[in-house]
A protein has these predicted regions:
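Short amphipathic beta-strand/extended segments with alternating polar/hydrophobic composition
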Residues: 13-24, 73-93, 160-166, 208-220
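Envelope-exposed proteins and targeting segments
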Residues: 2-4, 32-34, 59-61, 66, ...
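Conserved, short, structured surface segments that act as functional micro-motifs
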Residues: 114, 147-149, 175-232
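Zn2+-dependent peptidoglycan hydrolase active-site motif and core
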Residues: 126-170, 194-200
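Short histidine-centered loop motifs in beta-beta connectors
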Residues: 118-119, 124-125, 155-182, 206
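Surface-exposed, glycine-biased beta-strand/turn segments
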Residues: 64-146, 178-179, 188, 222-232
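Short, surface-exposed linear segments at secondary-structure transitions and domain or protein termini
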Residues: 21-35, 169-175, 220-230
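Surface-exposed, beta-sheet-biased, low-hydrophobicity segments with strongly acidic/polar composition
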Residues: 1-83
Length: 232
């Protein structure tokens, strides 16, 4: 676990996060009208390596903060994959450790979120995707099939999604995707001890690219599943 003390409107608040436990899938704090996701701190990298995907913050701590009356994004988010009933379970994150920042092999902070499901599980575009492609593939000589997709919002921010261990793409690379369109079958290439897909979420804005816990997106997907019907 890791903690911080933040001062908001002259009042101190102590925030605590756990990773590699069920509490990895936490509710954000709502304080004085702000929704706060306490994403990461540098201190844990005194004893954890960063050898399984980028995830260390550039400063002492990393937060995602927004107006608590707003959604994570302006439109409903379609499930990225079939959502496990009842929410994500830490025991279904590869070997029970590979949530965001979880200790992969007990020693390396995990730069993504693993969700166990069978090889060939459909993956869908959570929102419209402007461009997408394999940035690594077995065919190109890499040890994995890794997909990347981008969406640019009206305010200029770009959201970057990645999914690894892809069995195959089901659409042509660089073809724009509509929300809910299947783009791949997941979990089938170099997935190790348990078939799973590895999800990554980045935000590019103001000239910087920031990695964030993919749980933030999945949290909104579960919220939206209660209020919207999606076709796949």
């Amino acid at each position: 676990s890791f903690t911080c003390v933040v001062k908001i409107n002259d009042t101190e608040h102590t925030l605590e996060r756990e990773v590699s436990t069920q509490r990895s899938f936490y509710e954000p704090w709502v304080i004085d009208g702000l929704r706060i996701w306490f994403d990461a701190v540098q201190d844990i990298f005194d004893f954890l390596a960063e050898a399984h995907g980028e995830c260390c913050p550039r400063k002492h701590a990393r937060f995602a903060i927004q107006d608590a009356t707003l959604r994570i994004c302006p439109e409903p988010i379609h499930p990225w994959c079939p959502l496990p009933e009842g929410g994500l379970k830490i025991e279904h994150c590869y070997r029970g450790e590979d949530c965001w920042l979880g200790a992969y092999n007990g020693a390396s902070a995990h730069g993504g979120l693993d969700i166990n499901h069978p090889a060939g599980t459909p993956l869908w575009a959570p929102f419209d995707i402007d461009d997408h492609y394999y940035f690594n593939s077995v065919e190109m000589g890499h040890n994995n099939n890794r997909w990347r997709g981008m969406h640019r919002w009206e305010n200029g921010a770009e959201w970057i999604l990645q999914a690894h261990h892809m069995t195959e793409l089901t659409v042509q690379e660089h073809k724009p995707l509509k929300q809910g369109e299947q783009f791949a079958r997941g979990a089938g290439v170099w997935s190790g001890d348990a078939e799973h897909s590895h999800f990554v979420f980045k935000v590019h804005d103001y000239g910087e690219t920031i990695l964030l816990d993919p749980w933030i997106l999945f949290w909104q997907m579960y919220q939206d599943q209660q209020h919207f019907s999606f076709e796949s």
